[in-house]
């Protein structure tokens, strides 16, 4: 496992780097997730294996450190991922992100176009969302006060969703709450506004039982490919793993 300091206190972001051919592929997990749980089997699948692969645990998640004075905004995450890519001696990578990881991937591709050659996002938020106790996971988390979420809310959400607990227990409650606030707040310009003018190949993946994609017409008009996975919800890598792999492999196949 590799590590790199990402703040003035020496807090470390950590990742796995497996050898393979270029272009390298970088995978970014979602909120309260980990790299190996979200993408370990995906990246090692025969249809995707053979490329150099970076599986990054984002700050506050998994094996990475979780400083209490860090912002956990999308731009802050994107800056860390950019630093990891550069530390690995890479450029023009294929970037794949799920949920919050997809938001971060969009921001990174827009801020640092020199680092990204192809972009695949799976059910990433494209627009800011209001905190909402009945909304998406990030909306429910951000609706709670930070102190309340840290003291009781994070544990309560894990108790209500035992499957989610398997990765959430490896994450820091404060970091998860601030990350959720970052997701619903979004970027400036918005993720959609950053995504549309990009000139690299872009694919947006959604599950037919997952989150509603608002404004697909704007994506299609800008040349973003939209792929739907049948029988999959938001956690498509678990619901339909073979179809998820096939969709990513197709998105990362160079067009001739």
Question: Where in this protein do the model-derived segments appear?
Answer:
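Flexible "cap/lid" loop of the alpha/beta hydrolase fold
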Residues: 106-111, 115-148
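Catalytic histidine-centered segment of alpha/beta-hydrolase-like enzymes
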Residues: 232-245
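Conserved HGGG/HGGXW glycine-rich cap/lid loop of the alpha/beta-hydrolase fold
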Residues: 9-65
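Conserved serine/cysteine hydrolase catalytic core
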Residues: 173-230, 237
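Glycine-rich His-Gly loop
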Residues: 27-31, 99, 207
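Gly/Ala-rich beta-loop-alpha elbow adjacent to hydrolase catalytic centers
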Residues: 97, 101, 105
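Active-site loop/oxyanion-hole signature of alpha/beta-hydrolase fold enzymes
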Residues: 40, 52-96, 246-249
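Conserved alpha/beta-hydrolase catalytic His-Asp/Glu region
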Residues: 130-136, 143-197
């Amino acid at each position: 496992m590799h590590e790199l300091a990402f703040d003035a206190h020496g807090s470390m972001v950590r990742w796995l780097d497996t050898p393979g051919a270029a272009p390298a592929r970088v995978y970014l997990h979602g909120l309260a997730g980990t790299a190996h749980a979200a993408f370990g089997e995906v990246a090692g699948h025969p249809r995707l294996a053979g490329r150099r692969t970076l599986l990054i645990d984002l700050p506050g998640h998994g094996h990475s450190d979780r400083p209490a004075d860090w912002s956990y905004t999308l731009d802050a995450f994107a800056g860390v991922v950019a630093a990891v890519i550069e530390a690995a001696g890479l450029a023009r990578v294929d970037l794949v992100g799920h949920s919050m990881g997809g938001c971060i991937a969009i921001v990174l591709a827009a801020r640092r176009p020199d680092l990204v050659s192809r972009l695949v996002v799976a059910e990433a938020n494209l627009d800011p969302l209001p905190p909402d106790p009945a909304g998406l996971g990030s909306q429910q988390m951000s609706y709670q006060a930070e102190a309340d979420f840290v003291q009781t809310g994070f544990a309560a959400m894990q108790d209500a969703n035992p499957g989610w607990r398997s990765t959430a227990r490896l994450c820091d409650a404060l970091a998860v709450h601030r990350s959720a606030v970052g997701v619903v707040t979004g970027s400036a310009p918005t993720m959609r506004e950053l995504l549309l003018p990009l000139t690299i190949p872009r694919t947006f993946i959604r599950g037919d039982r997952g989150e509603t994609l608002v404004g697909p017409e704007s994506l299609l008009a800008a040349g973003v490919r939209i792929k739907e996975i049948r029988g999959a919800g938001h956690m498509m890598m678990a619901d339909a793993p073979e179809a998820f792999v096939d969709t990513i492999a197709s998105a990362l196949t160079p067009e001739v």
